[in-house]
């Protein structure tokens, strides 16, 4: 019934990407512009993933595992750049190393056929991003940035990452462990709703943020 919704996530990413481009004048640094690049990368991956099976006859796990490796690494590096305390930045580097190691361990686990969903790498990545996001929020709330944090595109971007991945993680793990029945209609509905929430945060950040808080 809702299977078609999953394919509309492409248009959500496209909308966010377009608004990001329109808002480039408010993104003064390479770090801020990097947010738009990540979104456009998602647009490309959504389209490639859609046609991958048609082109190759294979399931598109290859595409989305590659997407996970790049985007999660990018999220961790973004959070590292936003952290001001040296020990927190060191934790971010350790998180990046741990995630990359987990990803390649997943490849070794599926060495006979790596065209599977790397569920455990996804879970580890989400947990690491949650830890770093908490450190980022703690630093904000313990500094003068608390006065204008809603005007920062970075706050809204990190919030968007969290509102998608934190609820999706237990849902994905429940499917993987067969705690709930895999229903393509429900899966597509959940993915679509979480994408709406995430891209709403991204768009809010682009439109509501102010240039002076986006350095």
PLM segments and residue spans:
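Terminal, non-globular segments
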Residues: 1-215
């Amino acid at each position: 019934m809702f299977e078609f919704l999953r394919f509309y996530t492409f248009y959500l990413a496209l909308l966010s990407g377009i608004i990001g481009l329109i808002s480039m004048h408010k993104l003064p640094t390479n770090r801020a512009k990097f947010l738009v690049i990540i979104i456009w990368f998602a647009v490309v991956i959504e389209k490639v993933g859609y046609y991958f099976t048609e082109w190759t006859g294979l399931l598109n796990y290859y595409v989305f595992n590659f997407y996970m490796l790049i985007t999660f690494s990018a999220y961790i590096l973004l959070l590292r750049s936003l952290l001001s305390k040296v020990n927190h930045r060191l934790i971010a580097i350790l998180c990046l190393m741990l995630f990359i190691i987990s990803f390649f361990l997943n490849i070794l686990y599926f060495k006979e056929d790596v065209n599977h969903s790397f569920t455990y790498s996804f879970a580890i990545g989400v947990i690491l991003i949650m830890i770093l996001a908490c450190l980022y929020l703690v630093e904000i709330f313990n500094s003068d940035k608390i006065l204008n944090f809603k005007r920062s595109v970075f706050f809204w971007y990190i919030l968007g990452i969290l509102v998608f991945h934190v609820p999706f993680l237990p849902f994905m793990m429940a499917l993987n462990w067969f705690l709930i029945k895999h229903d393509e209609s429900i899966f597509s509905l959940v993915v679509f709703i979480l994408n709406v929430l995430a891209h709403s945060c991204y768009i809010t950040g682009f439109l509501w943020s102010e240039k002076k808080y986006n350095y």
